[in-house]
Design a protein with these regions (language model features):
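Acidic/His metal-coordination segments adjacent to aromatic residues that form catalytic metal sites
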Residues: 23-40, 119-130, 256-264
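Extended, hydrophobic/aromatic-rich amphipathic alpha-helical segments that build helical scaffolds
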Residues: 42-59, 214
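Extended ligand-binding clefts on enzyme/binding-domain cores
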Residues: 42-43, 49, 69-209
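C-terminal capping/lid segments that line or modulate ligand- or cofactor-binding pockets
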Residues: 134-154, 205-306
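Inter-helical turn/loop segments and adjacent helix faces that build the functional surface
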Residues: 1-9, 29-36, 55-73, 154
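Aromatic-rich carbohydrate-recognition surfaces in CAZymes
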Residues: 1-26, 45, 49, 274-275, ...
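Hydrophobic core segments within long, regular secondary-structure runs in both alpha-
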Residues: 8-23, 49, 53-56, 68-83, ...
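Glycan-association/targeting regions that enable binding to alpha-glucans and other polysaccharides
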Residues: 293-403
Length: 403
């Protein structure tokens, strides 16, 4: 590493606290990176998983191997399920674009069962009344490129390539300076069609920031020429003073509104994280690689193809099934006894949870020998409160080739 052991210790408490928050609250996010929706977001999942792997390396360096192993186990489990949570197949868009599927922007947070990207609706902010919910499968976003940026998926992974085709079909906007992209399908954060300012509703316009992110994807895919072209597009989207705007105008000129095609809209300017992305892109192009890509995921998932031996059930992620051959890990926020059966209560087992270094109370249920079609049913006894949960939860055993 770049820091001596003594310096690492100075950061350890902060890293442990951050990792604890992620493992206790993930994989679902309460708010996506656009500060709008809760659920399973490819972007947030990528950040969470990459962060856990990096934190694990830090803990190992400080001699905390058992907590480090737990972080990697959690990262592996979440990484295994990214496609189940966020990748849809067999939609109208798939048929139209000749692809088998694509990653969606976000899927609803878990309620009574595990999220399916084809089930449920996602609330859209900044939309007029009566038009504020869309099927999750209908909302595309460039956010899925984060799976490559953070080292979890190869740029040429078929599902990533399919997603890029879907992104370009719905979100790419050709402008005088080159192509830019919208945030997501149906975005209402931007000026109205007549150029009047955003007033709680409107229409989202292209974000130069996303050209920088796409350039990093092109570089990861081995296309530095395309990345360099997008750098030029990115820079040509700046205002007269060289400041990068949040959004640019994508309609014919409206001189009376001071809006010109391809020029900054009335959005925030400068958008500081767009400038940060610009600086990172300059560095990446100089290095001929994505310089800020965390190496842990690349090594673990792309090269070694590590998979998880279990699936996790928790109250914010109540899985309804797991592949045959996997253990069932139950994670709780308080000490509990898992009262469970795999034969419709003919026989019963009681397994106590154990608290780990991050305040997670967990136990692994030995269900890896159950055959497909079996069902595990369980409830909880809470010793501290001396009460039963009084609700039964079930997890079915699927064929081993299911996610």
């Amino acid at each position: 590493g770049h820091l001596p052991r003594g310096k690492l210790d100075d950061f350890l408490a902060m890293i442990e606290s951050a990792a604890s928050y992620v493992v206790r609250n993930g994989p679902v996010t309460g708010e996506d990176r656009w500060e709008e929706d809760a659920g399973y977001s490819p972007f947030t999942l990528a950040v969470e998983i990459a962060a856990l792997l990096a934190a694990a390396d830090m803990l190992d360096a400080c001699g905390k191997n058992e907590p480090a192993n737990y972080l990697r186990e959690t990262a592996d489990c979440w990484n295994d399920q990214i496609e189940r949570w966020t990748y849809v197949t067999g939609t109208e868009l798939c048929a139209r674009e000749g692809i088998d599927g694509y990653h969606v922007r976000i899927t609803p947070p878990d309620g009574a069962g595990a999220a399916s990207p084809k089930d449920g609706f996602v609330p859209l902010k900044n939309r007029p009344p009566g038009d504020s919910h869309r099927p999750a499968e209908a909302i595309i976003s460039p956010d899925a490129l984060a799976l490559v940026r953070f080292g979890l998926r190869a740029a040429d992974d078929t599902r990533i390539v399919n997603t890029v085709k879907a992104i370009d079909a719905l979100l790419r906007c050709e402008l005088p300076q080159g192509p830019l992209w919208y945030r997501y399908t149906g975005d209402g954060y931007g000026e109205h069609e007549d150029g009047s300012p955003f007033d709680g509703t409107g229409r989202g316009r292209p974000w130069p920031l996303l050209a920088g992110e796409r350039a990093h994807y092109e570089l990861a895919a081995g296309r530095p020429g395309k990345a360099a072209e997008l750098l030029e597009t990115f820079e040509r989207s700046a205002g007269a003073g060289g400041l990068l705007p949040e959004q640019v105008w994508d309609r014919p000129d409206l001189p009376e509104r001071e809006l010109r095609l391809g020029a900054p809209s009335g959005s925030a300017m400068p958008l500081v994280w767009a400038h940060a992305e610009h600086i990172k892109l300059l560095r990446s192009l100089r290095d001929s690689k994505v310089f800020d890509m965390p190496p842990q995921g690349v090594e673990r998932y792309i090269k070694r193809k590590t998979v998880s031996p279990f699936r996790t059930w928790r109250f914010n992620n109540k899985i309804r099934s797991l592949p045959a051959g996997k253990l069932l890990r139950v994670e709780l926020a308080a000490r509990g006894v898992v009262h469970w059966s795999s034969d419709k209560w003919l026989t019963v087992r009681d397994d106590n949870t154990v608290e780990n270094a991050f305040g997670v109370h967990l136990v692994d249920l030995d269900v890896d020998g159950l055959q497909p079609g079996s069902t595990v049913v369980f409830t909880f006894f809470w010793p501290e409160a001396s009460r039963w949960e009084n609700v039964d939860f079930t997890v079915g055993i699927d064929p081993s080739d299911s996610q």
